Amino acid sequence: MIFKKAHIALNIIMSFDRYKEVIEEGDTVIIYVNIHSMYSLEVKPEKVNKNGEVTTNIFQTSYGALKVKDLIGQRFGTKVRLSRGYAYALYPTPDLWTRTLPHRTQILYSTDISLIILQLELRPGSIVVESGTGSGSLAHSLVRTVAPTGHLYTFGKFGALFKR
């Protein structure tokens, strides 16, 4: 068993606690093709293929391919060209993140999360301890609620999930 503090992972992988205008390498972007086709994507210009070779990172959608390096320097909300259509590169809001993350664990959705935040009377500056981080759906919303002066401590049993 591996136990880690998830708030560390959230700060390294993505900047959900603050909004930014321009996409940079390492950011998480939501690729919105249509209401039924949304994908979360980490912006890395290159990736290692099955043979161990470094290649251009190309993201495939039902409307064609997107060269991930073309996202760098674009503003969030930009319409991006695919080989057979277009999509939008959106900022990962808590709701979009919950809709696009891989559901390896049971997650809470926005309506339930809103009720939890209301009942706990959370606001900027609050300090929250969460147990059972799982996919990070609740943690993402909690961080956005208590930011910029609050703090979220979240713990979970991760193993391979933490490495993703």
Region locations from a protein language model:
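Generic preference for well-ordered secondary structure
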Residues: I13-S15, T100, Y153
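S-adenosyl-L-methionine
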Residues: I31, S83-L118
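Charged, low-complexity, helix/coiled-coil-prone segments
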Residues: G52-Y63, R104-I113, L161
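N-terminal auxiliary segments of SAM/dcSAM-dependent transferases
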Residues: I2-Y88
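Phosphate-binding glycine-rich loops and adjacent basic patches that engage nucleotide phosphates
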Residues: G73-L82, P102-H103, R123-G132
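Short intrinsically disordered, low-complexity coil segments enriched in acidic
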Residues: M1-I2, S135
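The AdoMet/dcAdoMet-binding core of the Class I SAM-like
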Residues: I107, T111-R164
